[in-house]
């Protein structure tokens, strides 16, 4: 039984790594986003770390403290990760892939849990590494004014962890929605408009909209000292979204006829 689980775990990893979407997204989050973060920090250094709208008319708000610099850039990667989650979630239903996978592991419950676990761990690792590279690049761009890119600070490591949780939970949610609907379209229609400021627009006007997934996730990204206010609440409610949707996907998967899966 353990050998079957190990084989199934490796199979899931291979499918993720060799997916075309993974090959596209990884360069975005590992190379392009850190580069953007570096360029942004250079621009901040040119303006001045103490600049405010009063001293520089091009600024809308004051430059945030050093520990918060770089986190604005990771919103780009969040967009890419949500798309990746949606594609990975719907991937099993393409070209009868699901039926082929179940030949390796006929126990649908074990198959789903293994697949969900492997995907979640992969997503968290990618999220953490990407965000670290982006923040390290930003601090490197600040030259002597910045923190050591290797050591950073306790607060920055805490912010990186929160950002990684935000990315991971939103990406796994995107994955679960796509798995439930057997298509990436549901995830993209529900989550991407929220990333494009729709979530913030609604949250500013409707109290309940603050509990939309992307709004909760963005509350975990330390773009300014005003942002990280109730991280425990945000993680709790965002985790609840993931738990509920993934449970629906799980029970639907157990009951459906895989032969008619598409």
Where are these regions (language model features)?
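Membrane-interfacial segments
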Residues: 43-48, 93, 97, 137, ...
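Transmembrane helix boundary and interhelical loop/hinge segments in multi-pass membrane proteins
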Residues: 83-104, 108-109, 116
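Junction motif at the cytosolic side of a transmembrane helix
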Residues: 15, 240-262
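Aromatic- and glycine-rich beta-strand/loop motifs that create alpha-glucan
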Residues: 1-30
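Alpha-helical transmembrane segments of multi-pass membrane transporters/permeases
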Residues: 184-193
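Secretory targeting signals
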Residues: 21-22, 26-88, 112-180, 197-200, ...
